[in-house]
Amino acid sequence: MVRMNVLADALKSINNAEKRGKRQVLIRPCSKVIVRFLTVMMKHGYIGEFEIIDDHRAGKIVVNLTGRLNKCGVISPRFDVQLKDLEKWQNNLLPSRQFGFIVLTTSAGIMDHEEARRKHTGGKILGFFF
């Protein structure tokens, strides 16, 4: 089976493991985008530590779950988001104003929408979590 969207598979498996109440989840294959997305989630405390296992193939990631995550998902296609349009996406994707994050890929790297607003940069929308 050919994987069309590696990030979507990773977030779906995290979502399913979280719903089942698991403590850990194994994600494969590993990619830079997944690692950066997980780093943003970890920075906000939605997941615990994660470990990258290099098996000289595509690699694996073991993610420790904390039980704080309600939902995470990918936005496909990756729409361009200007800074002024970010508010609309926030209203569409997130349940409330002070809750959850949208992850963007910008010229300054992969970051959440609040950091993008602070750095005054737009980009393409990758996904969300809350």
Swiss-Prot record:
Q: Which residues carry this modification: N6-succinyllysine?
A: 88
Query: Where does the protein end up?
Result: Cytoplasm; Nucleus, Nucleolus
Task: Give an example GO cellular component term for this record.
Answer: extracellular exosome
| Signal sequence, start to end | none
**Role noted for this protein:** Component of the small ribosomal subunit. Part of the small subunit (SSU) processome, first precursor of the small eukaryotic ribosomal subunit. During the assembly of the SSU processome in the nucleolus, many ribosome biogenesis factors, an RNA chaperone and ribosomal proteins associate with the nascent pre-rRNA and work in concert to generate RNA folding, modifications, rearrangements and cleavage as well as targeted degradation of pre-ribosomal RNA by the RNA exosome. Required for proper erythropoiesis.
Which disease does the UniProt record connect it to? Diamond-Blackfan anemia 20: A form of Diamond-Blackfan anemia, a congenital non-regenerative hypoplastic anemia that usually presents early in infancy. Diamond-Blackfan anemia is characterized by a moderate to severe macrocytic anemia, erythroblastopenia, and an increased risk of malignancy. 30 to 40% of Diamond-Blackfan anemia patients present with short stature and congenital anomalies, the most frequent being craniofacial (Pierre-Robin syndrome and cleft palate), thumb and urogenital anomalies. DBA20 inheritance is autosomal dominant.
The identity of this protein, by name, is Small ribosomal subunit protein uS8
